[in-house]
Amino acid sequence: MNTALTRFRPLIPAGGVGSRLWPLSRAHAPKFLLDLTSSGNSLLRDTYDRLIDLSNGSVMVVTGTSHANAVTQQIPELRAADLVLEPSPKDSAAAIGLACAIIHRREPDAIIGSFAADHVISPVDEFQRVVTEAVITAATGKIVTIGITPTEPSSAFGYIHASESLGIEGAPNTHAVDTFVEKPDTTTAQKYLNSGEYTWNAGMFVAPAALMLKHLEANEPELYAGIMEIANAWDTPEREAVMERVWETLPKTAIDYAVAEPAAAAGDVAMVPGSFSWDDVGDFDAVARLNSEKSGEQLTILGEKDNVINHGCSGIVVANTERKISIIGLDDIVVVDTPDALLVAPRSKAQAVKDAVGEVKARGLNNLL
């Protein structure tokens, strides 16, 4: 094993509801706890399994207190010391920053890696090779992001513009990062795709914990002070009291704003291209595509397959009740049947599910969220 890997401590921020996957994904059963690819595992479990072999048996999960039981049921071997529970959502900088601070307090020379709980990645061995290259690069004193080669001019992701190769032994594909670009419009995204100089920012990064905290202190001093106070009490009897007093005072901000973008401007960020298949499973169109690619079938059925009567339809049906669902002669449909809500839409409008959720909120139907 490369010596840098002995310092590697991955963490998984497991948050967010996934509103474009409503009514299947809810606050009490969010996207990352679901099996959306018919693998037999949740997205969280698959993420954990990809990382555990690289980590000397220690992967930290950061999630909301309401998901603690579900997380430990899905990952029964997760150590209590590796489960960080947030009393309320505070965005990615607080979640990742606190995990980073706890790891750094325990192991000052640790290299952390942050990987979202709800992505689909294959093949696993290629992902692990890329992460190893990122860890080797991070050991030289860099924050390393993993850039995904764009397959379309998407306006749903941020972009990374890289420059010269850094020539790091053991990490031949590493490049310096010039800038992070916010989610562009479709025309600009097409220009990025045509240039071949940009990769998608998938929110995966590897870095020395000390370097992450250095940039967090410089750019978000109030947030830094709060998470350090919590981290210093974490492995003591004072944890709950300090968490209760400090957590709600922390400012909300994303890790890209708090660390990645200013670190790139300071020349501290590198990029390793992700030469693997990646999908953030952002809507039901993605769920249908991923399952169809695996099964070769035109209609994906999640849930109770015997409850679906299909006559020449394609798309996706989620059958989460005992009700029988009969569909006839419809192409590229989305049907999601749950005990208290039913969604019907064409796959082409899968992104608009978020608008439907907005209407549910506006009507005060919080029990459906």
Where are the model-predicted features located?
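Residue-level signal for inorganic ion chemistry
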Residues: 44, 99, 118, 160, ...
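Short coil/turn connectors at secondary-structure junctions
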Residues: 6-8, 56-57, 79-80, 107-110, ...
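Residues that recognize and position ribonucleotide moieties
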Residues: 113, 205, 280
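Left-handed beta-helix
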Residues: 2-7, 209-211, 215-369
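Conserved N-terminal catalytic core of the sugar/cofactor nucleotidyltransferase
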Residues: 1-13, 19-27, 32, 37-126, ...
